[in-house]
A protein has these predicted regions:
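Paired acidic/hydrophobic, glycine-rich loop segments that form the ligand-binding mouth/hinge
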Residues: 55, 69-76, 160-165
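Glycine/Thr-rich phosphate-binding loops of Rossmann-like dinucleotide-binding domains
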Residues: 83, 130, 172
Length: 304
């Protein structure tokens, strides 16, 4: 078999995620090559993500596959649009890494230990709104850049604390010893519900490619079910990766899920949770509809 060409962004974390896919393919005796792609998010790092539109981490990477420059695209699934572009489909997801958000600080052990007036960095609307909801006395400053850049800004004293995905830290630490031993405080999902599909690496390719069956071998079924349930719930409300919504499903047993979904806008927080049974699309739809009803009852309109 020819080498599999893998398209992805060129950031340190993205290269690590490609490496995780490559290792699985190499175990099957398949060689790979890397195709680096610059995305809109890479080119406009000074701009807030909310101003760049949707799909800023994935469009150009997917286009490389559509153009025949690569065989597959590897993404952090939380950055993907809710609908896969025409001609492409989700081939597989790797086993989920921790889905939670974490706070990293050199001086403080958690959000509620930060002194009034301290500066906390994040580029996520969901995280910003959560900080304002719980700690209006903190200064929230936009934080763009790859995860290693964000950590460097923290260590250089530009921020007193930052909030990032736990998965990004664990992946960095696994493949680069300089990131081992970073202490962080993990958020319980009832306090800060993660973004949909956080901690999941997705593999996307052409719908008509014969490679599709090969990548099915890499698919983690439990993670796939959780991913579909979360995306379904998000689609019910119409939110994207820049919306103030968090959702997390855990498949407890085949067809049984624990789910939680939260809307938070800095002034109001609405959370629904429970145990659900059925296929991923069904349980995701149920949770999404429950939250949507409560949002509408409060007279809140979410921008899509």
């Amino acid at each position: 078999m020819k080498k599999i060409r893998i398209a992805a962004r060129g950031s340190k974390l993205s290269r690590i995620q490609v490496r995780m896919v490559e290792e699985k393919l190499n175990k099957l005796g398949i060689e790979t090559s890397f195709v680096e792609v610059k995305t809109k998010a890479d080119l406009f790092q000074a701009s807030p993500l909310s101003q760049l539109g949707k799909g800023v981490f994935e469009k150009e990477v997917n286009q490389a596959v559509i153009n025949g420059e690569a065989d597959i695209a590897v993404h952090s699934m939380k950055d993907m649009l809710s609908e896969t572009p025409p001609g492409l489909e989700l081939y597989a997801v790797l086993k989920r890494d921790p889905p939670f958000d974490v706070l990293i600080s050199l001086s403080y052990r958690g959000l509620f230990e930060l002194e009034s007036g301290k500066v906390i960095g994040t580029s996520s609307m969901r995280r910003k709104n959560s900080i304002v909801f719980y700690r209006k006395d903190l200064l929230v400053r936009d934080l763009r850049g790859n995860i290693d850049t964000r950590l460097r800004k923290l260590f250089q004293g530009e921020y007193d604390a930052i909030i990032v995905a736990e998965a990004s830290i664990t992946r960095l630490a696994t493949y680069d010893h300089q990131y081992q031993g970073i202490n962080y405080s993990k958020f319980d999902p009832t306090l800060l519900t993660p973004e949909a599909n956080q901690g999941i690496i997705a593999i996307v390719g052409k719908s008509n490619s014969p490679l599709k069956d090969l990548f099915r071998k890499l698919n983690d079924e439990k993670t796939y079910h959780e991913a579909i349930a979360e995306r379904t719930a998000l689609n019910i409300i119409g939110g994207g990766c820049h919306s103030p919504l968090g959702v997390l499903f855990e498949e407890l047993d085949e067809g049984e899920y624990r789910g939680i979904m939260t809307f938070i806008d800095g002034k109001k927080k609405i959370t629904v949770e429970g145990i659900f049974r059925g296929k991923p699309e069904k349980v995701g739809g149920e949770l999404g509809k429950r939250l949507l009803k409560e949002i509408k009852d409060e007279g809140i309109v979410i921008e899509t």
